[in-house]
């Protein structure tokens, strides 16, 4: 018995709890299993009996510390004697909340030196009161980072939890999440240890000293996958689902978890459409359609971590590879958006098979070479506008009948009307709604993205600054007045004049203000490629004249002739266009001039300023401005760091564009005088 305990402790210290729960431990050449996963309907009876033998238990006021023997944890949940979750319970009636007191307790009174709080020894640590719940996967003193585990208000109205007529707002935690089957599902299908391989591309030993973070689902991620699986089990094959999740939702992980779980789904009854048998899986393959190379590798790494045979996964970069993967019955096939036409044709030719088509409509097709390939195949130029992936997919679907042997799952943050009508749920009044919603407002309020409209102003709005300064004498200094004269008294009708305003602001208010620990960058958005080229020349000329220590880059597709001279992105930047995003990461490159390319699907957390001289409306306006919303905690990035100066559009049109995706947005019509001093 002591040998067993010793080996368990050694494996926990070396590999962590997730590994121990998912793998055998070996004691004197005898293999022991410490947890049996939840079976599917297709599993043997013996597997179901083993799962039933798992012992889940709860203790109250659990002592745990050799350092502070009197310390107690309010609640600990175990499986087969291994702690899974700790919970600190707070009561607002005694003026204690989870958001403050619960988190403070973990940060200040729970030492990571105590075994139960060693990183990787538990799956998550919860701070809970009757209104809200929060969790962390790593107790790390003052650096402990908590995330909300809340449902969000109805209809995307923001963070928190809705009123529960039958009890506490957080009752869902014990009624639905901390239950035997759900906990087992989380252990087997959601929790992962990240060793940093996806980012670095290097293989490392999967031991705790190399572990970077423990991945645990937020509530909306667990909820969307659970609801989708439940609906498919009931209905069967052939439905379309729209998952409208904002940036900051962790969409990549949600998509990955869905792919892994959907291939194991069995029908709940034979009434489920295209069900073959109650113990037979509904889908032959899940096809993930994406253009994000990072997501491609992330899916592969995650599924490998889940213990799935890599022989069941295929990467289809060509039509031939895609055809072979489908014919060979690969369970998970990862392909690109430009292969979507071939997918539609291929699956219609194998009508006896069922497919789950998971579309990552992250609008990332505009961020790289893959975009150019798809645009070429559709005779579309992204720099002529309207070239994001859901428009392309929508066009393809109109040209091809959607196969009834497929279920379609579309993930997007900003669905267009056509996408909503094709994939959404129609209510009794004829309105369409997404199957699942995680709104921009909730993401902002929970701190996962920033509010890009916090400091949005039109050029005309600068006139309001004059009165602000007159009414606030403390700001009426020579520096402010000099800046205002240059900005307000000039009507910038020419590109050169507008470029001077842009560079003046960026250099004085962003670069020399050392925003983001002196890492801040900007994007200039122009109406077309010709304007982009002219802006690039104007900005570069001024930067050279002023001897500024940073460069301006440009991004556009193809070749463009301006004033009799031919230009390409690669020639202007001095390196291949496939390297533009990577080169823009360098400190020396601070401003990126674009027309349409990089307006969607481009994630650069250092972007803090945007200068717009282009008509924007609807979804494209939201997508463009959202280039600034990525958080960067390591750089201290907050909404107040952002600044958008718009020479073309109105505050009213921007509010109208954002309203469908962000309820109750507050949009200031004029910038506050304080921008002169930030």
Give residue ranges: language-model regions.
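ATP-dependent helicase/translocase motor core
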Residues: 1-285, 294, 298-309, 338, ...
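Interdomain helical connector at the RecA1-RecA2 junction of SF1/SF2 helicase-like NTPases
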Residues: 167, 418-519, 536
């Amino acid at each position: 018995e002591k040998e067993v305990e010793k080996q368990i402790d050694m494996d926990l210290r070396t590999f962590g709890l997730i590994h121990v729960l998912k793998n055998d431990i070996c004691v004197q050449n005898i293999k022991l299993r410490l947890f049996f996963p939840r079976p599917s309907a297709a599993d043997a009876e013996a597997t179901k009996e083993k799962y039933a033998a798992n012992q889940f238990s709860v203790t109250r006021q659990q002592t745990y510390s050799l350092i502070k023997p009197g310390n107690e944890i309010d609640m600990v949940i175990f499986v087969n004697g291994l702690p899974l979750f700790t919970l600190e319970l707070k009561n607002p009636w005694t003026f204690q909340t989870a958001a403050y007191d619960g988190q403070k307790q973990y940060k200040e009174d729970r030492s990571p030196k105590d075994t139960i709080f060693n990183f990787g020894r538990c799956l998550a640590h919860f701070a809970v009161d009757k209104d809200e719940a929060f969790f962390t996967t790593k107790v790390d003193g003052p650096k402990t980072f908590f995330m909300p585990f809340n449902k969000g208000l109805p209809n995307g109205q923001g963070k928190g939890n809705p009123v529960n007529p039958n009890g506490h707002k957080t009752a869902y935690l014990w009624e639905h999440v901390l239950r035997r089957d759900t906990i087992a599902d989380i252990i087997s299908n959601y929790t992962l240890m990240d060793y940093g391989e996806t980012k670095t591309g290097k293989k490392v030993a999967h031991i705790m000293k190399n572990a970077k973070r423990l991945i645990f689902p937020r509530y909306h991620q667990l909820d969307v996958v659970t609801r989708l699986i439940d609906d498919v089990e009931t209905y069967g094959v052939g439905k379309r689902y729209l998952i409208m999740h904002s940036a900051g939702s962790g969409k990549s992980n949600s998509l990955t978890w869905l792919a892994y779980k959907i291939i194991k789904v069995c029908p709940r009854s034979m009434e489920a459409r295209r069900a073959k048998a109650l113990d037979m899986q509904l889908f032959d393959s899940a096809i993930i359609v994406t253009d994000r190379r990072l997501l491609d590798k992330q899916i592969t790494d995650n599924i490998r971590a889940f213990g799935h045979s890599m022989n069941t996964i295929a990467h289809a970069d060509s039509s031939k590879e895609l055809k072979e993967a489908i014919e060979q019955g690969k369970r998970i096939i990862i392909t690109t958006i430009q292969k979507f036409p071939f997918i539609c044709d291929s699956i219609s030719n194998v009508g006896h098979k069922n497919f789950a088509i998971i579309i990552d409509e992250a609008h990332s097709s505009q961020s790289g070479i893959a975009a150019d390939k798809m645009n070429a195949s559709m005779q579309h130029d992204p720099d002529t506008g309207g070239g994001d992936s859901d428009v392309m997919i929508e066009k393809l679907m109109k040209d091809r009948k959607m196969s009834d042997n497929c279920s379609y799952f579309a993930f997007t943050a900003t669905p267009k009307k056509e996408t909503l009508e094709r994939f959404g749920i129609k209510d009794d009044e004829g309105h369409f709604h997404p199957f699942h919603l995680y709104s921009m407002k909730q993401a902002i309020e929970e701190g996962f993205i920033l509010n890009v409209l916090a400091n949005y102003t039109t050029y005309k709005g600068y006139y309001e600054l004059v009165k602000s300064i007159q009414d606030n004498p403390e700001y009426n200094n020579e520096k402010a007045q000099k800046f205002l004269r240059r900005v307000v008294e000039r009507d910038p009708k020419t590109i050169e004049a507008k470029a001077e305003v842009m560079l003046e602001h960026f250099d004085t208010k962003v670069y020399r203000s050392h925003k983001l620990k002196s890492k801040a960058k900007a994007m200039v958005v122009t109406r077309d490629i010709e304007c982009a080229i002219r802006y690039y020349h104007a900005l570069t000329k001024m930067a050279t004249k002023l001897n500024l220590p940073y460069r301006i880059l440009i991004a556009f597709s193809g070749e463009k002739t301006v004033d009799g001279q031919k230009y390409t992105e690669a020639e202007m930047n001095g390196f291949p266009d496939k390297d533009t995003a990577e080169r823009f990461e360098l400190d020396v490159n601070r401003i990126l001039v674009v027309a349409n390319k990089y307006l969607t699907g481009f994630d650069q957390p250092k972007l803090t300023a945007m200068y717009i001289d282009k008509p924007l409306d609807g979804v494209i306006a939201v997508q463009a401005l959202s280039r600034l919303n990525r958080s960067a905690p390591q750089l201290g990035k907050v909404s107040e760091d952002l600044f958008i100066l718009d020479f073309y559009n109105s505050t009213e049109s921007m509010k109208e564009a954002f309203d469908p995706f962000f309820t109750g947005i507050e949009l200031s019509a004029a910038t506050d005088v304080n921008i002169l001093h930030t």
